[in-house]
Regions:
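Clamp-loader machinery-focused feature within the broader ASCE/P-loop NTPase space
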Residues: 2-131
Length: 131
């Protein structure tokens, strides 16, 4: 069950009940959007939700650690790079970027999602991507 963690104090009871009901029913949508102001715990809530989903199909005690370390074979996290770190090269499709504010996600990262999702799940029934 999803619990309110110390660093995630904005997770209100209604959201917690909704996410827990999804887990109980084992009825998942193809995608979820966690939105809100910066610093309210969207990523932490999403990671906790993903951990609970994987716990439904596996009894391994290391799921939480593997999710946190982005080391689960059925989980992929895609994070934007800051514009200062990104290098745009006109010669390579891999370096073309999609801009979003001050951060970018490379096209190669999006292609990686496609490859990842086309492969069979290894440790669970689901494959999950967090962007």
């Amino acid at each position: 069950m999803i619990k309110v963690k110390k660093n995630n104090f904005f997770l209100n009871e209604e959201i917690k009940r909704y996410l827990n009901s999804i887990i109980k029913k084992n009825s998942y949508a193809n995608g979820y959007i966690f939105y809100g102001a910066e610093g309210v715990g969207k990523k932490e809530t999403a990671l906790e939700f993903i951990t609970e989903i994987f716990k439904q199909s596996s009894s391994s005690g290391t799921i939480e650690e593997r999710i946190t370390n982005n080391n689960h074979p059925d989980f992929l996290i895609i994070e934007p790079n800051s514009t200062l770190e990104a290098k745009i090269s006109k010669n390579s499709d891999l370096e073309k970027t999609t801009k979003s504010g001050s951060e970018i996600i490379k096209i190669a990262q999006i292609r990686n999602i496609k490859t990842f999702l086309s492969q069979k799940s290894i440790n669970s029934e689901k494959k999950i991507v967090l962007i």
